[in-house]
């Protein structure tokens, strides 16, 4: 959601800045990942949305569920709870993860394929894409049967569409204009 992204951005940047100061970038990434996963669970999500549960109770429950030990991360959860923003934790995690990748000079890439790819195919694609985008890429693969065949690659805001669906769409656009 674009709205959550806008709200989460300053929180992610502030937390990342603090993590840099404390040399805790990677460990806090793990804590945020756990928090984001827990917040998306049905019972926890309904608890967060319940107005009769006060903010400190919500924060304490989340901290206990995840088993947070780090003082700054606990304080972060308490601040989010106090501002009724616990539901944006998954987006904060996603943006924090992007900041971490950027800090490590790594870009995130998603390869969409109509069919499952072998490890060898993913490795070969990774080599070609690393050269093409002149950067180390963290690659994830998602299956999208509607592509019909071929692949589509997203790196940041760049899209490389080599799918049959993409070619058919381009052909349709050309024929209708």
UniProtKB/Swiss-Prot annotation:
Name one molecular function that GO assigns to this entry.
proton-transporting ATP synthase activity, rotational mechanism
What are the entry keywords?
ATP synthesis, Cell inner membrane, Cell membrane, CF(1), Hydrogen ion transport, Ion transport, Membrane, Transport
Give the membrane topology, semicolon-separated if more than one. Peripheral membrane protein
State the PANTHER family in the record.
ATP SYNTHASE DELTA CHAIN
Q: Which family does it belong to?
A: Belongs to the ATPase delta chain family.
Which HAMAP family did the record assign? ATP_synth_delta_bact
Q: How does it assemble?
A: F-type ATPases have 2 components, F(1) - the catalytic core - and F(0) - the membrane proton channel. F(1) has five subunits: alpha(3), beta(3), gamma(1), delta(1), epsilon(1). F(0) has three main subunits: a(1), b(2) and c(10-14). The alpha and beta chains form an alternating ring which encloses part of the gamma chain. F(1) is attached to F(0) by a central stalk formed by the gamma and epsilon chains, while a peripheral stalk is formed by the delta and b chains.
- Protein name in UniProt: ATP synthase subunit delta
Species name: Neisseria meningitidis serogroup A / serotype 4A (strain DSM 15465 / Z2491)
């Amino acid at each position: 959601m674009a709205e959550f992204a806008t709200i989460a951005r300053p929180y992610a940047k502030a937390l990342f800045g603090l993590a840099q100061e404390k040399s805790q970038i990677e460990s806090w990434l793990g804590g945020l990942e756990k928090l984001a996963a827990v917040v998306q669970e049905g019972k926890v999500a309904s608890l967060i949305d319940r107005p009769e549960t006060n903010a400190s109770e919500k924060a304490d429950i989340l901290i206990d569920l995840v088993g947070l030990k780090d003082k700054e991360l606990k304080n972060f959860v308490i601040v989010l709870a106090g501002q009724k923003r616990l539901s944006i934790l998954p987006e904060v995690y996603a943006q924090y993860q992007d900041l971490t990748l950027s800090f490590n000079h790594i870009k995130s890439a998603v390869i969409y394929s109509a069919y499952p790819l072998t490890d060898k195919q993913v490795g070969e694609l990774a080599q070609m894409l690393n050269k093409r985008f002149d950067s180390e890429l963290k690659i994830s693969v998602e299956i999208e049967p509607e592509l019909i065949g071929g692949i589509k690659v997203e790196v940041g805001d760049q899209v490389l569409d080599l799918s049959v669906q993409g070619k058919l769409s381009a052909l349709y656009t050309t024929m209708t204009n």
